Amino acid sequence: MAQVLIVGAGMTGSLCAALLRRQTSGPLYLAVWDKAEDSGGRMTTACSPHNPQCTADLGAQYITCTPHYAKKHQRFYDELLAYGVLRPLSSPIEGMVMKEGDCNFVAPQGISSIIKHYLKESGAEVYFRHRVTQINLRDDKWEVSKQTGSPEQFDLIVLTMPVPEILQLQGDITTLISECQRQQLEAVSYSSRYALGLFYEAGTKIDVPWAGQYITSNPCIRFVSIDNKKRNIESSEIGPSLVIHTTVPFGVTYLEHSIEDVQELVFQQLENILPGLPQPIATKCQKWRHSQVTNAAANCPGQMTLHHKPFLACGGDGFTQSNFDGCITSALCVLEALKNYI
């Protein structure tokens, strides 16, 4: 039975797992490892510590589907709409740039519900707090070491974490990446930003006419969303949640500052945008060191195969673009590359 490891429980990794399960007729052991405490990657949904039903999307806010991808990836959209994982965005987002024919979708149960859907479909064994440190070749298998626990062996590996994290891995993988591939990987770049989630008590009123707003006149804040309103799930029994995304220049400037300092600065600027906001009962500040790809890997559409037997490839938005369709494209390319090795 083939033993497959997918590193990264984000959009690309979870879809790779689901597609692999659907397209493999024989027995298959499928493991998904992630360094975080939950699935989602940059499509993460945080919960209030006081009420798990009070949630906030700290990564991707909504999904924009262009006419090109509406046709090309129709089966993926149809499936998620049929399961109720996605729903058309019906709430007003001020300052959103709309192009003709584009459709926007939200995830009523939180954006991470997309990832949870695919992981469930995959039947994979999903492990959190598993940070991969080394990948070595041992008797035609991959031996994978993590920060804690014993090394484990696999026949095939797909790496879907941000490219700089792939380049940090130790072991034989460092010599298996060719000089040309290394240059391509080192040229991949990302923007950085912070996201802040604010959770409120039930009954709290945040009286604004919009569900989300792009801010153009603030050095710190780029986007604000009343998250439950954006997802059209307002309830008198569950408090509202607010999501703030910082600008990229702010994210870069304060990248190595403490979360507490950053949170305080964002709060100060938020007072200028939404004066007199009530006090939240909980907050969650998320640093996105690798937020969105600004330069994807050149000349390797969708994935990069680092080794054939045993198979090792990397995929993710670093090889396409930082959106839902970019991740689908990468997952399909990974599957195409490994189908002869499974």
From Swiss-Prot:
Needed cofactors: FAD
Tissue spec: Secreted into the blood by the kidney. Highly expressed in the kidney, expressed at lower level in heart, skeletal muscle and small intestine. Its plasma concentration is markedly reduced in patients with end-stage renal disease, as compared with healthy subjects.
Enzyme Commission number(s) from the entry: 1.6.3.5
GO molecular function, one term: oxidoreductase activity, acting on NAD(P)H
First-level EC class: oxidoreductase
GO BP of this protein: negative regulation of blood pressure; negative regulation of heart rate; response to catecholamine; response to epinephrine; response to ischemia; response to salt
Keywords from the named record: FAD, Flavoprotein, NAD, NADP, Oxidoreductase, Secreted, Signal
InterPro entries: Amino_oxidase, FAD/NAD-bd_sf, RNLS
Residues at which FAD binds: 12, 42, 61-62
Presence of the UniProt keyword Coiled coil in the record: no
Catalytic activity: 1,2-dihydro-beta-NAD + O2 + H(+) = H2O2 + NAD(+); 1,2-dihydro-beta-NADP + O2 + H(+) = H2O2 + NADP(+); 1,6-dihydro-beta-NADP + O2 + H(+) = H2O2 + NADP(+); 1,6-dihydro-beta-NAD + O2 + H(+) = H2O2 + NAD(+)
Localization annotation: Secreted
A UniProt-annotated Pfam family: Amino_oxidase
A Gene Ontology cellular-component term: extracellular region
Main location: secreted
Annotated signal sequence range: 1-17
Function: Catalyzes the oxidation of the less abundant 1,2-dihydro-beta-NAD(P) and 1,6-dihydro-beta-NAD(P) to form beta-NAD(P)(+). The enzyme hormone is secreted by the kidney, and circulates in blood and modulates cardiac function and systemic blood pressure. Lowers blood pressure in vivo by decreasing cardiac contractility and heart rate and preventing a compensatory increase in peripheral vascular tone, suggesting a causal link to the increased plasma catecholamine and heightened cardiovascular risk.
Similarity remark: Belongs to the renalase family.
Protein name (database record): Renalase
Organism this protein belongs to: Homo sapiens
